[in-house]
Regions:
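Active-site and adjacent substrate-binding regions of carbohydrate-active enzymes
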Residues: 1-472, 476-502
């Protein structure tokens, strides 16, 4: 995967596809959907850390009845690998001690699978589980954490996984600067991983490109890719830890993205698992939902950077359909509401922000079709949270609609992998026009000899005047049915173009 632009797809296993009518997405369910990723031509998939399933588990049956067995997970991984799709794990170093304890619990349950839960607790639990209550700081005791990492690495390597996305962001940190201890840890992680398996990829999740500058000053590599998803926070009030929604300013997103678009080893994710759907927060929930989703696809895929698609965004999914505040399933909901009331923030503003911002909007069930539970599960009498436009924007409906967001994603991925455009995309000089940022527009231009390829991406809800050379030819638009007799002098809301000049 190194030194080559790649397209990743991030998902939650338990929300993706249920194969056994338990109401939980499982390993077999994910395997059943392999053709979906072949259709999209995805290079790799980021999975949630399955060791989390073992937290407080009393028996293997409890886990395997929901998600499947470790052998089923390994089979699923191997089949994806044999189809040239890499499989990786999202690993949060802020919770590495918890992951290590979960690994030990998994070890206990597998070693004692013929015992009763009480026997397992008595004979093995105390022996293995780490009850150390030290502060969970990955940089305080590096030796200990490297030991944790070794065990977890071996576990996933033996299951056939190909890469880690390692989160080193500390939410409690007062700044995003990387210190010497952090750099030293990253170096050691990379060295350990490559010694065990040279082809295993280390992707570091960070909030800025400082590591990119540090890498340039090093004699040896310290990571394979950077992963940045901080952009999802734009349009949120950081004063209240992203609980409140503020006005989205398209130019702000373009300005932030500009620094990362030139690098194949930087993976950009517009969305993240921690905050609501970008199609609702940044796009248009009414007339221009489809066009907005396509424009975000262009923003993600048109430049030289690698990219991560968060599951459901390729369908143009909107925020979750919430019927009651209890659907948020948040223990401190009322406490947060009362606190914000003391700051003169009304209940209506608070609740509306939750509808758009809450992570449940990006972590609900994947809609496959119009069958019960949108094809996610055949279980009856169980309530699921789903996107409010799942009836219109599910995989089958999108697949059958040539104007859909899903088919536009497929077109774009095929386009950037097309041999006819490979040379200019890989070897052409890339430039970005900043003069139209204030309008919510970015121009990404590739030039190779006399050939020019231009992406004009409008993420504004308003029509915008724009000047484009009449020598270009339009080869694709986010407005599927619009007929262009000439190069336009203005763009409609979320109207974005791909143009070519030979």
């Amino acid at each position: 995967m190194a030194n080559k632009k790649m397209i990743l797809y991030q998902l939650k296993i338990d929300k993706f596809k249920d194969s056994n009518e338990t109401g939980y997405g499982d390993y077999k369910g994910l395997l059943l959907q392999i053709k979906y990723f072949q259709f999209l031509q995805i290079d790799g998939i980021i999975l949630n850390n399955i060791l989390d399933y073992y937290k407080n588990a009393k028996s293997l049956a409890e886990i395997e009845s929901k998600y499947g067995s470790i052998l089923e997970f390994k089979k699923m991984i191997n089949i994806y690998n044999s189809n040239n799709i890499k499989m990786g794990i999202n690993l949060d170093f802020n919770n590495l001690r918890d992951t290590f304890n979960n690994w030990k619990q998994a070890k206990i349950l597998h070693e004692n699978k013929n015992f009763t839960p009480n026997q397992t607790q008595k004979n093995a639990f105390e022996k293995y589980i780490d009850k150390n209550n030290k502060e969970n700081d990955i940089f305080l005791n590096q030796t200990e954490f490297l030991d944790f990492y070794n065990k977890i690495f071996d576990f996933y390597l033996n299951l056939g996984c190909n890469f880690f996305v390692i989160n080193i962001n500390n939410e409690n940190s007062k700044n995003n600067n990387i210190n010497e201890k952090e750099i030293d840890l990253i170096k050691n992680i990379y060295k350990i991983s490559k010694q065990k398996n040279e082809s295993f990829e280390i992707i570091i999740k960070t909030k800025n490109h400082e590591l990119h500058k540090i890498q340039a000053s090093q004699k040896e590599k310290i990571y394979d890719f950077l992963f940045i998803d901080k952009f999802s926070e734009i349009g949120s009030d950081k004063t209240y830890k992203n609980k409140l929604m503020i006005k989205f300013k398209p130019w702000q997103l373009l300005k932030e993205l500009r620094n990362y678009l030139s690098y194949e080893d930087v993976i950009i994710s517009l969305a993240s698992e921690h905050i609501g759907r970008i199609n609702s927060r940044w796009g248009d929930e009414l007339a221009f939902n489809k066009e907005a989703s396509k424009s975000f696809a262009l923003l993600l895929l048109a430049a030289r950077n690698s990219a991560n698609i968060y599951y459901g965004d390729e369908l143009g999914l909107l925020k979750a359909k919430i019927e009651d505040y209890r659907d948020f399933n948040e223990f401190n909901y009322n406490e947060t509401k009362r606190y914000l009331e003391t700051k003169n923030i009304s209940t209506d503003i608070f609740y509306n922000s939750y509808l758009y911002q809450h992570s449940i909007s990006v972590n609900n069930i994947m809609p496959w079709n119009l069958e019960p539970n949108f094809g996610f599960s055949k279980i009856k009498n169980k309530k699921f949270i789903f996107a409010e436009n799942s009836k219109q924007n599910n995989v089958v409906s999108e697949f059958n609609d040539p104007t859909s967001s899903l088919n536009f994603y497929k077109y774009l991925i095929e386009f950037i992998k097309n041999k006819d455009f490979e040379e200019i995309l890989n070897n052409g000089k890339i430039s970005f026009s900043k003069d139209v940022f204030k309008k919510g527009i970015i121009k990404i231009k590739y030039k190779l000899q006399n050939k020019k390829l231009l992406f004009v991406i409008n993420i504004s809800k308003k029509s915008r005047k724009i000047h484009l050379s009449k020598k270009y030819e339009i080869i694709k638009s986010t407005y599927h049915d619009k007929k262009y007799l000439n190069i336009p002098n203005s763009l409609d809301p979320f109207e974005s173009l791909i143009l070519l000049k030979k």
